[in-house]
Amino acid sequence: MNILVLNGPNLDRLGKRQPEIYGRTTLADVEKLLVKRADALGVTVIVKQSNYEGELIDWVHEAADAGWPVIINPGGLTHTSVSLRDALAEIHDGAGFVEVHISNIHAREEFRHHSFLSPIARGVIAGLGVMGYELALEYLVLNSHS
């Protein structure tokens, strides 16, 4: 089983950008953590990051065509991107996706409280730090329809 893990804008800056909110763990650290956990669960993760909405959408389309579930931390696109939601709707109808946020978006600025993606996600994990990625991975493996 393959699971696509997508990280949106600015997540390449993990460990450097606002460490008081996001911690000091880098995206490379997150990828190592996920690969190790995936190996233990007997699955494969493909971890990608882009600062460009269109590239994320292209990757979602590829996952939809392959029938892969997705873990996505959309970053700021959470609150703005109808296009990303429309792409993920196809995953929603298939293998499903889990929305992950390192920080608790509901405890932050008002504009961060709304997610265009949450209503169609299998689940949302927010505020548990990078552990949220691991929890999403475990959920998708345990609840796979394949």
Curated annotation (Swiss-Prot):
The active site is at 22 (proton acceptor), 101 (proton donor). Pfam families: DHquinase_II. The record marks 17 as: Transition state stabilizer. It catalyses: 3-dehydroquinate = 3-dehydroshikimate + H2O. Disulfide bonds: none annotated. Gene3D superfamilies: Dehydroquinase, class II (3.40.50.9100). It is an enzyme of class 4 (lyase). SUPFAM superfamilies: Type II 3-dehydroquinate dehydratase. GO terms for molecular function: 3-dehydroquinate dehydratase activity. Keywords: Amino-acid biosynthesis, Aromatic amino acid biosynthesis, Lyase. Pathway: Metabolic intermediate biosynthesis; chorismate biosynthesis; chorismate from D-erythrose 4-phosphate and phosphoenolpyruvate: step 3/7. InterPro entries: DHquinase_II (IPR001874), DHquinase_II_CS (IPR018509), DHquinase_II_sf (IPR036441). Its EC number is 4.2.1.10. Substrate binds at residues 73, 79, 86, 102-103, 112. One of its GO terms (biological process) is amino acid biosynthetic process. It comes from the Bacteria. Belongs to the type-II 3-dehydroquinase family. PANTHER family: CATABOLIC 3-DEHYDROQUINASE. Homododecamer. Catalyzes a trans-dehydration via an enolate intermediate. This is 3-dehydroquinate dehydratase. It comes from Corynebacterium pseudotuberculosis (strain C231).
